[in-house]
Amino acid sequence: MTNMRKTHPLFKIINHSFIDLPAPSNISSWWNFGSLLGVCLMVQIITGLFLAMHYTSDTMTAFSSVTHICRDVNYGWLIRYMHANGASMFFICLFLHVGRGLYYGSYTFMETWNIGVLLLFAVMATAFMGYVLPWGQMSFWGATVITNLLSAIPYIGTTLVEWIWGGFSVDKATLTRFFAFHFILPFIIAALAIVHLLFLHETGSNNPTGLNSDADKIPFHPYYTIKDILGILIMFLILMTLVLFFPDMLGDPDNYMPANPLNTPPHIKPEWYFLFAYAILRSIPNKLGGVLALILSILILALMPFLHTSKQRSLMFRPITQILYWILVANLLILTWIGGQPVEHPFIIIGQLASISYFSIILILMPISGIIEDKMLKLYP
């Protein structure tokens, strides 16, 4: 009798995805982040579900309901801080996952990559709306500033903003709809993640060399299941260290003040994971130009397959592009730092230079270096 996991309609899918899946024998720890993102999503959905049992999406009671969760609900403080810091872990894993894809040329799997970009937008939207829910000062003003950006769209902008707000300012209607969207989006993300995996399993995983690994495949279980479990344990160690020892390290103190439409905080800024994009937005004096640059800073990822000029897929054997890649990483760290600084000299000019170099490296320098490296290897006639 054949094994049930190979014949049962449901178990068969799980078997082909996580047990008997042929995987390259040389994928490094950089390939752990896909599974870590899956775990992050599950943690966020579970903690979020328990938070939603006690949260009220009303401007009068939202702030006090979060206080109630932390003070009166059994382990409510733990659930709340796991959810808040879990979002940070989610984005750390996301950035490393995307960075891995850029370094090793995984963007040549077009369908997988494009769904990944869509997932990134969905996660960013979810995180933004989640940040509004506690209804603190930074929640309210963050929502006001970011939604207001849509007013830069010609002709329909103002109408669109008021339609999203559900009134003439960020108010009760806005909070209620943000809660509804914040609740539903993670399930859409989970569905998209399954499609992401579906497309990945059509081609098989990439590997550090960027070469075809069909000749040397190993079963996913036990080799990569045990490797993923180790990654998950390390991630939980970091997450729980944050939650139990430094729960507010990545948050903003202003969010411990209830939202007050009459009092603007001195420095309005989003959570740390949006700061790089926020810095790009602020570095352009024109409102519409800033919004376009903000969207393009993420959407540029979708252009990566078309900007690939080298005959080699991975950066493993491409030292010039490697240097440019690490300059890009440093550049993103500078943008993240600038996004959290006030709009004054010298931060303005640093932000503008970092924004220009961000787009220049991706759109101009990396494609040129790919051609130069091929010429050096005499791959061109």
UniProtKB/Swiss-Prot annotation:
A ubiquinone binds at H201. CDD domains: cytochrome_b_C, Cytochrome_b_N. Binds 2 heme b groups non-covalently. The cytochrome bc1 complex contains 11 subunits: 3 respiratory subunits (MT-CYB, CYC1 and UQCRFS1), 2 core proteins (UQCRC1 and UQCRC2) and 6 low-molecular weight proteins (UQCRH/QCR6, UQCRB/QCR7, UQCRQ/QCR8, UQCR10/QCR9, UQCR11/QCR10 and a cleavage product of UQCRFS1). This cytochrome bc1 complex then forms a dimer. Component of the ubiquinol-cytochrome c reductase complex (complex III or cytochrome b-c1 complex) that is part of the mitochondrial respiratory chain. The b-c1 complex mediates electron transfer from ubiquinol to cytochrome c. Contributes to the generation of a proton gradient across the mitochondrial membrane that is then used for ATP synthesis. Belongs to the cytochrome b family. This is Cytochrome b. The lineage of its organism: Eukaryota, Metazoa, Chordata, Craniata, Vertebrata.
